[in-house]
Amino acid sequence: MQRRIAVVAVFVMIALAACASASKPSAGGTTPTPTSSPAPAVTPTAAPSPSMSMSVPSVSPTVAPAPPAPKPAPPAASTKPISCTGEIAQTRPVASGTGPGGSLVSTGSPAVALTFDDGPDPINTPKILDELKQCGVKATFCVVGFRARDNPEMITRIAAEGHTLCNHSWQHLFDLAKRDDAYIRKDLENTNKMILRAAPGARVAYFRAPGGNFTTKLVKIASELGMNSIYWHVDPRDWESAKFGKGTVMVNHIIAAVERDVRPGSIVLSHDNGKPDTIVAYRTLLPWLKARYTLIALPDAPPSPAPGAPLP
């Protein structure tokens, strides 16, 4: 029994010695580390050089749409004085005929009358007045009643500088002739009232229907108020910018139309209200016209009747 115990003890000692030997690192050895999966090898890709043959898809650049063409600006009005000298003989036939409703289209003499409608305009009317003064020319201004009320200083200046004032209705209704007689009469009387308030010594001897839409009834009522009805012989259509454009193209159109159509005795229609191209065109037209024609304001007639009651 004792022998067996001794043998077992020997084996236990041998086992313990083996365990102790395994737990110590060997000389020059390293402490083992946990094993991990190796990182995949990455082969760097070189950027293609210009010499490398590669198929590169072409990319069309995105082109922004072109901006819209700017609207033509009115030509800048020159401040240089206009020279209206010289004299050129002309042999064109005298203007004749009558307008709608028996209205006048000519002056009844070889003289030419320039007329400016729809004002007074606080911006453009002073400019055309300045041009007329530089050339020593008188004209006729067919003014709208409510604009005469709102710009009395312009009416005062027109009269003071020797131009003729013309009634162009209260608010430029194209269908004025279709209104009843009482309305038409009040419309014209109130327009005269505003003109005479600003220029007490003036005479309102003429009437022009809005759009030239005369009827015999309209002509008759104007006559009863002491006014002759005037149409025109030359219309450059300076108001039709939708057809003729704006800026330089309109200026050139106005000049060409007036020079082509004017005759001795012509009444020429133009517009000062909101028409800067017309003002620029007359810097060229005034010297051209004055060299060929006598330019007049339509002559005054007896004083207009006293204005009636205001419009309701």
What positions do the PLM features span?
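N-terminal pre-catalytic segment of deacetylase/amide-hydrolase enzymes
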Residues: 2-9, 13, 19-114, 121-130, ...
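Catalytic grooves of carbohydrate-active enzymes
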Residues: 258-299
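Active-site beta->alpha N-cap acidic-glycine motif
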Residues: 72-179, 183, 187-200, 204
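Alpha-helical scaffold elements lining the catalytic groove of polysaccharide deacetylases
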Residues: 172-199, 213-264, 280
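Short helix-capping segments at alpha-helix termini
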Residues: 135-136, 198-201, 225, 288-293
